[in-house]
Structure formats: structure tokens, C-alpha cells
Amino acid sequence: MTDVPVSRIRNFCIIAHIDHGKSTLADRMLQMTETVAQRKMKEQFLDNMDLERERGITIKLQAARMNYRSKDGEDYVLNLIDTPGHVDFSYEVSRSLAACEGALLVVDSSQGVEAQTLANVYLALENNLEIIPILNKIDLPGSEPERVANEIEEVVGLDCTGIIKASAKAGIGVDEILESIVHLVPPPSDTVDKPLRALIFDSYYDPYRGVIVYFRVMDGTVKTGDRVRLMASGKEYEIDELGVLSPNQIEVESLHAGEVGYFAAAIKAVEDARVGDTITLAEAPAKEPLPGYTEAKPMVFCGLFPTDADQYEDLREALNRLKLNDAALSYEPETSSAMGFGFRCGFLGLLHMEIVQERLEREYDLDLITTAPSVIYRVTTIDGEVIQVDNPSLLPSPQEREKVEEPYIEVEMITPETYVGTLMELCQSRRGVFKDMRYFTLSRTSLVYELPLAEVVTDFFDQLKSRSRGYASMEYQLIGYRENPLVKLDILVNGDSVDALAMIVHRDKAYYVGRALTEKLKELIPRHQFKVPIQAAIGSKVIASEHIPALRKDVLAKCYGGDISRKKKLLQKQAKGKKRMKAIGTVDVPQEAFMAVLKLDPQ
């Protein structure tokens, strides 16, 4: 690894929607620059997790350093910083964009621009990156390069006269892409003499070496053995190992401004080396940290309970381990009368929640029950105190609270024109407020709505996809809190409140949600020997109820003819037994019943 002048370093990332071919393009680049030997190459080389390969999405960021000899005969170092493409991980995206000077905008030439891509392009423009547009998958029969190029010009506002037409899978146009990175992406600014400032854009936990931090040096130089300080947390560490990612780790002695690499310093948990933090030398610290650091805050909460109570400790251990790798995950112990012991977990968004659940079940072999996701409500009490409530069962009673506010988001959906009507209907049914509508091309329309986050966290995304036959895409951002008449809806089974089924809903929708839920539970809870009432209530007022009829044993089967009083006596005896059973009997609520809340459609 020879020392490279700053003028020959190029730092870039790839912006693309899920499935538009980002990981495949990265694979081809690694192959063409001979960074990864042919025999070691596998598809989606930079996506390490099995889950990423299966879902075809990038969750954790990866980085790769490639040595490339350009057609002008010069040797260059290209640092690819991979980015996750999903809205839940937009903070990670913004940090990895801040570590680059250029971005490849990869668009599927058969699909066109998607909402997520747009959001990331705007982030890239905010960071003043040079954007190189690329049409991918031009070898597909459904490819329409002219239409999509016009769309990029219209929607993103980039000049597409010399747009690169490529097929990452077939390797078409990849040389052209590498050349354009060298000639169009500006080199990093040469600030080797300034005090050290480096940006952390990712970190992961290694069980043997502690946390491995991926960073980009902005100013100055860093060497093995240096004592560094993380400016946001104020903690200090000594660097044991310093290196570059090619994509496998290769140790080096020092890294200077413009370079991308990793270091290990016996850091115990990812929380101590947060994404976006600034690294500086402890002896000669920089005055100001790099701008843009914020702590990732959970937006969506749900309860996770093991189906088998014996697995509680295993679940704690698994969450501890995941937390080492995922600073945005938060959790605290919780007990529920219906489910026993478990944890209340906070996530960045829905995809993040699904991924964490799936990793817990797959990597740690746990069986879990999840409660309906909820958001953070802001409650002002009678005394004027403002409290945050993320669990419906903790909402103060109407007598104790003055107002309840809920988070709102602005959702941008990009969809073919045909589905505009049905998507507007969906947003209206979710208490959406229409803000804007733009036609980009004949086949593409942008819809902007303001929606309560609580209406989006359950199944909005699934509905969006099914109503638009998979063509629509969405992107959202938090816009603040608004006051609404919200109430707590309790579900009572056989007279007992089931805390795991409680939810906070808008007063106008409470009846419809209550009715839909009681009907659903009637189908899912098995019949018992006695009649089981299922009720939805607000406070002490029941607003919807259903009954599960009792199973009956025919006690008159032995009576052939004979006296009516004999039959009456047997029936009364049975009724008495049922009454006693109802008083002391418990109702088993199956796991499917808790999942039913997630798939309600109270229309």
C-alpha cells in the first residue's frame, strides 16, 4: 500500500433504489479493478449478512478501496462507500454521503426514478457532491433508456446528454463508469497539515477486537499508536490497528486527509463510537467537530416477548449483542399480564423493526411474539408537565391529561398515474392531509401527503404496494407534533383487559377499529366450555362487543322419553357448572390474535 497523493484519490458512493442494481455494479467494479480475486468473487460481495442477500437490500454499510490504472496511464485510488437505500437508514446515508465527493446515481432503465432515490439525491446535493447519472439494466427487453433519461432530467434536474448506459450484470459500460469517476469526481481537499479530524461513517462489533470503526480522514494524519478522542462522547482510545478496506482489511501504518480506512482500539460497544462522530487526536485536538452529527432516535416501538418464558434471558442476551452492532436500537424490560416478561424495543422505522425481529429469530433461534407497533406520543398533563408515552398502557386517564399530540410525517409517493386515485383514497382513510401533486412524465406522478406516523407504522407500506401492484414507492420525513383527539382503546376478553392488545386511536376511528378487532378476535380465539365475551372499550364505556358461543355437551343424550323434570334437572346442573367455570376459567388468547392487530383494515 504505497502513499497516494491526495490529487489521485476519489471518494464516491452509489445511490440507487432497492433492486436497481447497486450491489451488482459494486461487484463488477471490484472485479474490473482486480480488487477481489476472480475465485473469491461471489454475488453481492459487499452485502455480508445473509438477510441482506435474501432480501436484496443493503443494511450495514460496507466500504472498498480499489486501485485503478486510468486510460491516461495514472494510478488512482477509488474508495467506494456503500450506502443503504432504505428510508429507515437515511441518517447512515447522510453520513456516508458526507464522506464522499461524488455519487453515482444508478437508475433501472426499465423502472425509472423512485421516491427513495430522490430523497438520497437531495441529500447528495445538500452535501455538494458531483452526481454522475447511470442507466442500468439496458440489456433488459423492457428497458426504455430515452424515457428514463428524460425523467432524470425532469425530476432530478441533472443534465443527461452524455448519460452512461450500462448493464452491471453483463459488465457493459463499467469501464466508462470507472473513467468518469476519475475525471468527473473532484479529489478531496488537501488539508494534511491541519489538526486531525475524521468522520465515522460506520462501525461494527467484532467479538475478538471490540468495535471496528470505519472512517474517512477529513484533515490531518492518523497513525497506529495514536491516542484519539471521539468528540461527541469525549472518550479517548489508543489505536491498536489501523488499515484500509480492500474490501478485506489490510493493515497500514498511517492514513492522511482524503483516505478512507478502519481502526480498532478496544472499544466495548458501538454506542461509544457513534456514526457521524468526529475523531481527533487527544494531544492536539481540533477546535470544532465536523458538522451534521445527531443521535439516531427511535421512532417506532413495539413489545417483544418470547413464546416460551424460559427464553427471556436468551432474548436479553441476543438484544445485548444486536445492540453492540446497532446503536439505533433501544430496549428496556417490560411485563405484560397477557404475555409475561419481555422487552419494549425502539426502532428507526418499520423495515428496521422487521430486520431486528428476523435477526433475533434467525441468528439466535428465538420464538417471539410482537405487539402492535406504536409511536411516541407527547402528553401534557393537568399540572402542565409534558411526558413521552410509547406504550398505550401508560397513557394517563382523560381526567389526568390536558392534551395528546402525535408525530406527523410528510410522505412523498411516486406512482404511475393509473394508481393516483386509489393511493389518495388510502391516504384519506389514514387521516392524511393532501399537500401537493406533480406530474413528472406521463407515467410518473408525485403525491405529497401529511400523515400521522401512527397510521403509517402498521401496514401502510404493504397497502401502498398492493394498491399500486408494486409500482409505487414512498419516502417520508418527520415534520413535528400535532394535537388530536386521541383515546386509549382497551380490549377485554372475558371481562379482563388484555394489555398487549391496547392501542391509542383517533376518537372518530375508535368504533371502526374496535368493531374490526373484536370480529377478528372472535374468529381467532378458540371456543371454550363457556361463553366468552370480547369487548372493545374506551375507559368504562364499551363501544363494540362480540361473543364466542360455548361448546355444548349434549347432557340429554341418555334420556329416552321420560319425565321433563329429569331433563330440566340435568340442564340446570350443566348451567351451574358452566357458571362456575366462567367465574374461574381462563381464556387462552392464541399468538395469531396479537398479530391480528397488525393486519386490521377498519373500513
Curated annotation (Swiss-Prot):
CDD domains according to UniProt:
EF4_II (cd03699), EF4_III (cd16260), LepA (cd01890), lepA_C (cd03709)
- Give residue ranges for domain tr-type G: 7-189
The EC designation for this entry is 3.6.5.n1
**Keyword Ubl conjugation on entry:** no
Catalytic activity field:
GTP + H2O = GDP + phosphate + H(+)
Compartments it resides in: Cell inner membrane
> GO molecular-function annotation terms?
GTP binding; GTPase activity; ribosome binding
Q: Which UniProt keywords apply?
A: Cell inner membrane, Cell membrane, GTP-binding, Hydrolase, Membrane, Nucleotide-binding, Protein biosynthesis
| Pfam families in alphabetical order | EFG_C (PF00679), GTP_EFTU (PF00009), GTP_EFTU_D2 (PF03144), LepA_C (PF06421)
- Look up keyword Nucleotide-binding and say if it applies: yes
Q: How does it sit in the membrane?
A: Peripheral membrane protein
> Which terms does the UniProt entry file under GO BP?
positive regulation of translation; translation
Q: What family, per the record?
A: Belongs to the TRAFAC class translation factor GTPase superfamily. Classic translation factor GTPase family. LepA subfamily.
Query: Function of this protein?
Result: Required for accurate and efficient protein synthesis under certain stress conditions. May act as a fidelity factor of the translation reaction, by catalyzing a one-codon backward translocation of tRNAs on improperly translocated ribosomes. Back-translocation proceeds from a post-translocation (POST) complex to a pre-translocation (PRE) complex, thus giving elongation factor G a second chance to translocate the tRNAs correctly. Binds to ribosomes in a GTP-dependent manner.
Name the HAMAP family on file. GUFP (MF_03138), LepA (MF_00071)
Instruction: Supply the name of the protein.
Output: Elongation factor 4
Question: Organism, per UniProt?
Answer: Crocosphaera subtropica (strain ATCC 51142 / BH68) (Cyanothece sp. (strain ATCC 51142))
